[in-house]
Amino acid sequence: MKFIIKLFPEITIKSQSVRLRFIKILTGNIRNVLKHYDETLAVVRHWDNIEVRAKDENQRLAIRDALTRIPGIHHILEVEDVPFTDMHDIFEKALVQYRDQLEGKTFCVRVKRRGKHDFSSIDVERYVGGGLNQHIESARVKLTNPEVTVHLEVEDDRLLLIKGRYEGIGGFPIGTQEDVLSLISGGFDSGVSSYMLMRRGCRVHYCFFNLGGAAHEIGVRQVAHYLWNRFGSSHRVRFVAINFEPVVGEILEKIDDGQMGVILKRMMVRAASKVAERYGVQALVTGEALGQVSSQTLTNLRLIDNVSDTLILRPLISYDKEHIINLARQIGTEDFARTMPEYCGVISKSPTVKAVKSKIEAEEEKFDFSILDKVVEEVNNVDIREIAQQTEQEVVEVETVNGFGPNDVILDIRSIDEQEDKPLKVEGIDVVSLPFYKLSTKFGDLDQNRTWLLWCERGVMSRLQALYLREQGFNNVKVYRP
């Protein structure tokens, strides 16, 4: 099988040297992502496209899906590459390929040609289109807005029969821009802002301020791992967790109620800036949107920025919440975000929307900054690829099984869309559907006399959720890995 990767248009207008660098980086990213599917896969770069050739037909859908999620790709063409002799040979091959698709449809033929030939692209379009129209009685030519467009590419003595076109996510290849550190909470905003910077070519590391204990961190790890695995797995990134409970405690004890929100954000920026400097990261990324909450007014954002020289990027600054939620739905983080607790919102009952710098600084004089220094010094920094391995160690008391007992039930915790696309059926055992984002509220309603075997395709989510349920006191859970 063969795929032709078309570049994001902004790449094609770069200077020659920059364009070549971008294409080289994108080629490497594609190799890094796809090597998990087929080690014999070949990735070949050209001036205006990249070819991907693979032998394992069983991995075709997985490879195609992975390509649509790699930043820098505008669209993917799935093609059949065959030799040809003349225009009539092109027609005959097109007839075999497209006959079934054109039955009862209106169509047109579009041809791109490279190389030396005794015919033009329009000649091929007319010849093939006329032939298809004659040989498929129920088909009809329509040059504007046809139901089916037959795409052909002729290159020297090769014919590319385009079997399908699939849109990519566009943007720049990861690694073409510098690294950033995303302040991730697991909510709608931070997940979307992280994705937007990945799509713009940045390697995104994650910094999490833990305000809610182990369960909160597990949830945010899931979001970060999902984003990395889905859009950024071509590169290694860090997941940095900072235990911010001592900082919150100090703020609650010593800071005036109205100033708490702004001061908490200032402390977060201070801590994140130190982490960024430690790891050579150039900028911070937040999910703040203008006026969304009290700390996100222009006055307050300026005061928050003042505590650090590190550049702070806010890709969602002009977005409304509905737009952000729609983006979260598109990239797959909506379900995570809906069940993620929001701890920052409860810290202040009457927050100021227009903080005064002198008052903020006066309040911060009461704060013991050694506490902030200590939590930054004790950050937990892990390679995001190790999250699954760490989860295995953390849930060592949760048994992993590949067989069944008489009291066992498989609990499919994938999202509803995934379950509908690939229903799980296992002979001889009941399978119950309960998406992961409903486990925290609905698992207790299940029959607690049964043993529930949590299952997801990769096993990461099932292990994380097993740990969470164990922490909640449910001992009748295991992880199912066939």
Curated annotation (Swiss-Prot):
Classification via CDD domains = PPase_ThiI, RHOD, THUMP_ThiI
Stated EC number for the protein is 2.8.1.4
Active-site residues from the entry: 456
- Alphabetized InterPro entries for the sequence: Rhodanese-like_dom, Rhodanese-like_dom_sf, Rossmann-like_a/b/a_fold, ThiI_AANH, ThiI_fer, ThiI_N, THII_Thiazole_biosynth_dom, THUMP_dom
Q: Mark the transmembrane ranges.
A: none
> Could you tell me which residue ranges the THUMP domain spans?
61-165
Protein family (similarity comment): Belongs to the ThiI family.
- What is this protein's record name? tRNA sulfurtransferase
User: Native species of this protein?
Assistant: Escherichia coli O8 (strain IAI1)
Gene this protein is translated from: thiI
